[in-house]
């Protein structure tokens, strides 16, 4: 498993313990006490590092090459998943996957950004950066879900919508704007979960819902830290400073009222234990459906509208501005 920059002390100690255990197996010497001391030291070190993660550390975890994707969670959370393809206008975008499935026996529509696990798949899925046809495919599935009264679950994980020439020619901004408009008025429950990076309008194209949740080490922002640093300081190397200033973590966004709940992650990140992470997401989805149960269509839309109207409201007090 690939190590991150801040994890090097932990990895080095783990390797030392493993080497000592291997040596003990192949010799008559007993190092059990030394191993016990090192394992205790490892536990304290992990608690210190993972319990005090900086914003940039969380950015690295959110971008981890082995971080679970939408299809990983679909495999663990849903049954009878049937993927649907194409937007019926141009083509099929592999950067967004979606289809119908069953959640605890209940028919649902599942949609999400999809990154690749290796170079070949990343190229096929455009590194999880959708074209307009991806957002139009997602909208087609949402309207289908509305027609058949199926709840919608969206998984958000993208650096952003693809900014290439062809994407712009096919109406990238219109496709995202159309999704925002249509999602706001859907008459079925919509649950959105940020599972990795939530980047700019590319994330918002799947991000209008009744409840917005984030995994503990995911990020959600209007631009990447590197992009913000390049614009503000003409230096992408100041990405760490930008990340600190942008308030992009789950804890920051919950405090600001942008998201509803934070879903805990395994120590070190979701990639450490996909099954356990799926169970944590499952608990949150179940809890959210319980909260949405019994709400009429009109009330659903009204509450969703009120939710977004509150975001960004400010009050002036003693010349200070506070985000509600």
From Swiss-Prot:
Pfam families: ACCA. Keywords: ATP-binding, Cytoplasm, Fatty acid biosynthesis, Fatty acid metabolism, Lipid biosynthesis, Lipid metabolism, Nucleotide-binding, Transferase. It catalyses: N(6)-carboxybiotinyl-L-lysyl-[protein] + acetyl-CoA = N(6)-biotinyl-L-lysyl-[protein] + malonyl-CoA. One of its GO terms (molecular function) is carboxyl- or carbamoyltransferase activity. Residues 37-291 form the CoA carboxyltransferase C-terminal domain. One of its GO terms (biological process) is fatty acid biosynthetic process. It comes from the Bacteria. Signal peptide: none annotated. It is an enzyme of class 2 (transferase). It is found in: Cytoplasm. Pathway: Lipid metabolism; malonyl-CoA biosynthesis; malonyl-CoA from acetyl-CoA: step 1/1. GO terms for cellular component: acetyl-CoA carboxylase complex. Belongs to the AccA family. PANTHER family: ACETYL-COENZYME A CARBOXYLASE CARBOXYL TRANSFERASE SUBUNIT ALPHA, ACETYL-COENZYME A CARBOXYLASE CARBOXYL TRANSFERASE SUBUNIT ALPHA, CHLOROPLASTIC. This is Acetyl-coenzyme A carboxylase carboxyl transferase subunit alpha. It comes from Bacillus cereus (strain B4264).
């Amino acid at each position: 498993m690939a190590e991150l920059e801040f994890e090097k002390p932990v990895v080095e100690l783990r390797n030392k313990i493993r080497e000592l255990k291997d040596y003990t197996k192949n010799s008559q010497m007993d190092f059990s006490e030394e191993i016990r001391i090192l394992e205790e030291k490892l536990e304290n070190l992990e608690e210190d590092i993972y319990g005090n993660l900086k914003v940039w550390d969380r950015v690295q975890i959110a971008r981890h090459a082995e971080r679970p994707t939408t299809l990983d969670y679909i495999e663990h959370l849903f049954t009878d998943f049937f993927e649907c393809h194409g937007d019926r206008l141009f083509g099929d975008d592999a950067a967004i996957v979606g289809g119908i499935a069953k959640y605890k026996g209940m028919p649902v529509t599942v949609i999400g950004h999809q990154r690749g696990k290796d170079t070949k798949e990343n190229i096929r899925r455009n590194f999880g950066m959708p074209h307009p046809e991806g957002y139009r495919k997602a909208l087609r599935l949402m309207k289908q879900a509305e027609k058949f009264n199926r709840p919608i679950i969206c998984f958000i994980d993208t650096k952003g919508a693809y900014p290439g020439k062809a994407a712009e020619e096919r109406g990238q901004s219109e496709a995202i704007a159309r999704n925002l408009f249509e999602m706001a008025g859907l008459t079925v429950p919509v649950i959105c979960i940020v599972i990795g990076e939530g980047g700019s309008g590319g994330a918002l194209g799947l991000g209008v819902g009744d409840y917005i949740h984030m995994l503990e080490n995911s990020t959600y922002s209007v631009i990447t830290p590197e992009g913000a640093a390049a614009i503000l300081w003409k230096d992408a190397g100041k990405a760490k400073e930008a990340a600190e200033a942008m308030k992009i973590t789950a804890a920051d966004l919950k405090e600001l009222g942008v998201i509803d709940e934070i879903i805990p992650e395994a120590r070190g990140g979701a990639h450490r234990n996909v099954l356990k992470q799926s169970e944590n997401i499952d608990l949150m989805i179940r809890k959210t459906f319980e909260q949405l149960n019994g709400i009429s269509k009109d009330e659903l839309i009204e509450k969703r509208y009120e939710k977004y109207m509150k975001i960004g409201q400010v009050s002036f007090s003693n010349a200070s501005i506070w985000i509600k």
